[in-house]
């Protein structure tokens, strides 16, 4: 027997399908939303729809933005000759929080994972190689220290090495299997400063 009505169960199921939201959190959110004033729920749903409609990939680095270029790629004070390669926009945000990295980024939107059927053509590698035709001096590979992240880093290193562009990998200090988005700013900064050439 279902404890809640069809509408409540459906809302809980939809919320529980979001990453990082378990069943208890989904229930808590569902009850909160149901008890919110209708105008606030309407505003929230409109904001979600607007974001879905207007947010897209930056045409340069592939982070999420609502303009053609993200604020980082538009910023002429950034060092456009240094590109940090990250797996996702959350990792980019983690490095930006350090306030120390002055280059630009390239977001892969994933990592190579043969076990999951994700190959090099399934992430934004072709776009990265295209960017290297510009005035790029260094590529910093800042993928996660998971098996997939390490595989991706090695693949990128082998791909770029023949171009003569300096390729570095962030230092460890980031625990093996750790996701960058959960690492504190000091550890990320030390990993960036201690990067090694591939």
Where are these regions (language model features)?
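Conserved phosphate/pyrophosphate-binding and hydrolysis machinery centered on Walker-type P-loop NTPases
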Residues: 19, 38, 51, 63, ...
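Residue-level signal for pocket-adjacent positions within structured domains
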Residues: 28, 43, 56, 68, ...
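Conserved, well-folded catalytic cores of nucleic-acid-processing
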Residues: 14, 18, 36, 51-54, ...
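Solvent-exposed alpha-helical segments within well-ordered globular domains of core cellular machineries
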Residues: 9-13, 27-31, 42, 46, ...
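Long C-terminal interaction/binding lobes of large macromolecular proteins
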Residues: 129-198
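Cys/His-rich Zn2+-binding cysteine-cluster or related metal-binding knuckle/ribbon modules and their
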Residues: 2-8, 17, 27-92
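Extended interfacial segments that mediate partner engagement and assembly in macromolecular machines
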Residues: 26, 75-143
């Amino acid at each position: 027997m279902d404890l809640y009505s069809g509408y409540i169960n459906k809302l809980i199921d939809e919320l529980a399908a979001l990453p990082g939201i378990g069943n208890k959190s989904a229930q808590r959110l569902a009850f909160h939303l149901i008890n919110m004033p209708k105008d606030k729920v309407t505003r929230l749903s409109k904001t979600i729809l607007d974001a879905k409609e207007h947010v897209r990939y930056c045409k340069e680095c592939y982070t999420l933005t609502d303009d053609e270029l993200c604020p980082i790629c538009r910023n002429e004070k950034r060092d456009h000759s240094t590109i940090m390669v990250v797996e996702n926009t959350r990792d980019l945000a983690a490095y930006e929080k350090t306030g120390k990295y002055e280059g630009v980024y390239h977001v892969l939107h994933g990592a190579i994972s043969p076990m999951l059927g994700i190959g090099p053509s399934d992430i934004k590698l072709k776009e990265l190689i295209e960017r290297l035709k510009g005035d790029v001096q260094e590529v910093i590979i800042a993928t996660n220290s998971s098996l997939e992240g390490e595989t991706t880093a090695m693949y990128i290193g082998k791909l770029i090495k023949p171009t003569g562009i300096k390729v570095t990998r962030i230092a460890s200090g980031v625990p093996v299997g750790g996701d960058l988005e959960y690492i504190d700013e000091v550890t990320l900064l030390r990993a960036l400063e201690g990067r090694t050439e591939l």
